[in-house]
Amino acid sequence: DYIAFITSEGEVAVYQGTDPSDATKWSLVGVFKIARPIGKRCIVNVGPELIVITESGFVPLTQMYAENESNYSKAISDKISGSILTAVTNFKSTFGWEALIYPKGQFGLFNVPNGVSGEFVQFVVNLSTGAWGRFTGQDAYCWGLLNGDLYFGGNTKVYKADNGLSDAGVQIQGNAKTAFVYYGGRGTSKRFTAIRPIVSSDADLPVSIGFDVDFNDGTSTYTPSSATTTGSEWDNTAWDSGLWAGTISSQLVWRSVADIGWNAAIRIKTSSQAQSIKWHSVDIYYEKGVGL
């Protein structure tokens, strides 16, 4: 058995054994340093690993023991380091930092303050793929599990999370964006002409699509509606505001785009209440440029 003692300054002492009163059954494994931990609920077990919320991100303790505190790329939050470091800079002294593993949902949840008056967001990592997402609208001071179900404590109330198809009776807003991908390689620019997100739903739902190039954000604007629709063909409505009819089968509609760039990302935005929706994949048409 191992036990780790972590100080507020990030000093870690690891011991091995079963009886601290017996020198033959208790020994020091090592002492090392990590970035300073944040909050009193900064540690979570993920299998045999310990993840610690620190000023440099969410770091695995065993890997940091093998490396050193300056190797920030070892943090499991490396892909979202910008968002985490911004939160650390602004709210590291604010109550509410916490980590929790939710086996039923197959994700790890990191509760992060987003203000000084009870505002919070949750950064969520898929335990199977390592992909990150963010939950908003759940201002949780603390999280816990009861009989495998997920709960959080809000302002004077306890809520059951990950339950039902609405957000306390109102619509659930969803906004997803892919990573920027250098389609066809990094060496040339491309002219992007059409995209086809593969989306399925069990009801009519509004789905709006955006398209960004060269690390820009929000190059198209859209406002989803909660109204149902019979659908719209790609050549009869604006590509970034058309409503898709949701069925139990996937939607396979091409949307025209007209952008030139080195890389691209696709955005999808929707809202739902009492319905479910899945984004499976995306197809894209582009032409590679020649030379500079």
Where are these regions (language model features)?
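Surface-exposed extracellular loop regions of Gram-negative outer-membrane beta-barrel proteins
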Residues: 4-32
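Short, structured patches in soluble enzyme cores that scaffold and shape functional sites
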Residues: 7-8, 16, 54, 110-112
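Beta-propeller and closely related beta-sheet repeat lectin domains
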Residues: 2-3, 41
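Beta-sheet repeat architectures centered on beta-propellers
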Residues: 34-49, 55-292
